[in-house]
Amino acid sequence: MKPTKAGIRKRLAATAAVLSVSAALLVSAPGTGSAATTATPSLRAFGLTGDGTLMATFTTDRPNVLDWVRAVTGLSGDTRLLAIDHRVQNGLMYGLGEKGGLYTIKTPPQTTDVVVTKVSQLQVPLYGTNFGFDFNPAADRLRIVSDNGQNLRHNLNDHTTVEDTTLTTPPLTGPARGVTASGYTNNDLVAATGTVLYGIDTTTDNLVLQAPANNGTLSTVGSLGFDAQPNAGLDLFSQLTNGKTTSVVGFASLTPYGASTPTLYSINLFTGEPTAIDRFPLNITSLAITLTGS
């Protein structure tokens, strides 16, 4: 069903209400240009290297310290992973292969190495170099976007892939070529909270909203404030109370031009302003924060 404008406004309003709590806790008021003194939350996260062959784990307050680094094993029909994310419906971590394979991921201490198992295959070929990859928690669908404007929606339950409308940034016409990271808000199973899709456009160096997601319509939230290299990562962590999202925190892996490795940033979801936390010791370009933070 195509979402109505009223429905979209309702979801955006709900997200704004949740984000206002996050802003009070973690960032300064929009327009002040300074970060609050509140410490970065220590959340367990996983990262994928830019070549898609290694995974690591770290906490969001110390991205400079990798607790382990392991090779990705078990790929079938793919040679590397492009991106990773957690699925709210079952708590599992998934990865996307460069040929469109979709995998569940097991990590230490459950296994010695990072072991992936193929569970599905995109029915539409990937088109692009760098990709955003995130689960819609409300619809239980995978959203995959690319720096060529590709906009896919995949159902892991019946293995179907829908090719949604190409990404655009009105009033400009033609594909929006630059969105290389994506993240949905409100990772819970409460229908009333809804969800909104954010993205990072490394061509315009902006944080953007994709709404409606199926229509591929992009609007600018705010500037990152520097020139970022194309391969980026974005993930949004939802703090839950009684199973419902009460705050949302954004994190991004971004590599300023001239830097040798990415830096982990917290992202102000109202303004797009990034605040550097620390630099990764490896080329970590895709992020997946655990659903519980531990």
Question: How would you describe each model-predicted region?
Answer:
Residues M1-A35:
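Secretory targeting and sorting signals
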Residues T38-D61:
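An edge-strand/N-cap motif at the start of beta-rich repeat modules
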Residues R44-L48, L92-G95, R141-I144, A191, ...:
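Conserved beta-propeller blade signature
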Residues G52-F58, G101-K106, D113, N148-N155, ...:
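Structural motif
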Residues T53-G101, I105:
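N-terminal carbohydrate-binding/catalytic regions of secreted carbohydrate-active enzymes
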Residues V65-S76, V114-V124, T161-T173, T217-F226, ...:
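A short beta-strand motif characteristic of beta-propeller blades
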Residues S76-Q89, Q121-A138, T169-N187, D227-Q239, ...:
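Repeated scaffold domains used in trafficking and secretory/extracellular systems
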Residues V179, G183-D235:
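A mid-sequence, solvent-exposed acidic-amphipathic segment
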